[in-house]
C-alpha cells in the first residue's frame, strides 16, 4: 500500500489525515481503511514527515474481506502544514503633550489576537509615529509591530496598521 497525507493549516497538534492506496488486491475487490498518523511535530513546514502508527482494514466492495489481507503500520509519507491566520487589534497610543517630535508611546496590554489557539504563545511589541508633531485631536498614529513567542512562526499575522491619539498644547510657565 502507498500512503498519502493531506496538507493542513496549523491547528496546534501533529495529527495527520492519511489514506492508503492498495495494490495487490484480488480482482476488483476493495477494502475500507482507518488510518492513524501524525506529523513529526505540530509546527508549520513543507515536506514534513508523516508516520502511520495504526491501520485498521474493513470489508470493502466486490467481495473484499478485510480478513483476507494483512498490512503493517510504519509507512511514511510527507505533507505540509501551513500557517494559521492571526489578526492583531486593540493596540492603542497614549495621548501626549506637544514635544516637537512624532514619537508615540504604544500600549499593547489590551491587544487581542483573533485566531490564536488556546495555549499558544504569541506576543506583540509595537512602536508608533504620529502623522506630524503638531497638536490635534484624533491624530493618526502609524503602528509598526514585531512579534515574539514560541508559536509565532505558526501564524500568518495581519497587523493593526494604525490607531489615534491626541497631542495637547504645552503649557508655558511664567516666571
Question: At which residue positions do the language-model features occur?
Answer:
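Short loop/turn motifs that initiate or flank beta-strands
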Residues: 1-173
Amino acid at each position: 500500500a502507498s500512503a498519502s497525507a493531506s496538507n493542513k493549516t496549523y491547528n496546534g497538534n501533529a495529527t495527520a489525515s492519511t489514506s492508503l492506496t492498495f495494490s495487490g488486491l484480488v480482482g476488483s475487490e476493495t477494502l475500507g481503511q482507518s488510518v492513524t498518523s501524525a506529523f513529526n511535530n505540530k509546527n508549520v513546514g513543507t515536506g514534513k514527515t508523516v508516520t502511520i502508527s495504526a491501520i485498521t482494514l474493513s470489508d470493502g466492495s466486490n467481495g473484499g474481506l478485510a480478513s483476507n489481507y494483512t498490512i503493517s503500520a510504519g509507512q511514511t509519507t510527507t505533507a505540509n502544514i501551513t500557517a494559521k491566520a492571526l489578526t492583531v487589534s486593540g493596540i492603542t497610543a497614549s495621548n501626549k503633550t506637544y514635544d516637537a517630535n512624532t514619537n508615540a508611546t504604544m500600549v499593547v496590554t489590551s491587544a487581542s489576537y483573533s485566531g490564536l489557539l488556546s495555549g499558544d504563545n504569541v506576543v506583540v511589541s509595537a512602536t508608533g509615529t504620529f502623522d506630524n508633531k503638531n497638536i490635534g485631536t484624533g491624530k493618526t498614529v502609524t503602528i509598526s509591530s514585531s512579534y515574539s513567542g514560541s508559536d509565532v512562526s505558526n501564524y500568518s499575522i495581519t497587523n493593526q496598521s494604525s490607531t489615534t491619539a491626541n497631542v495637547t498644547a504645552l503649557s508655558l510657565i511664567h516666571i
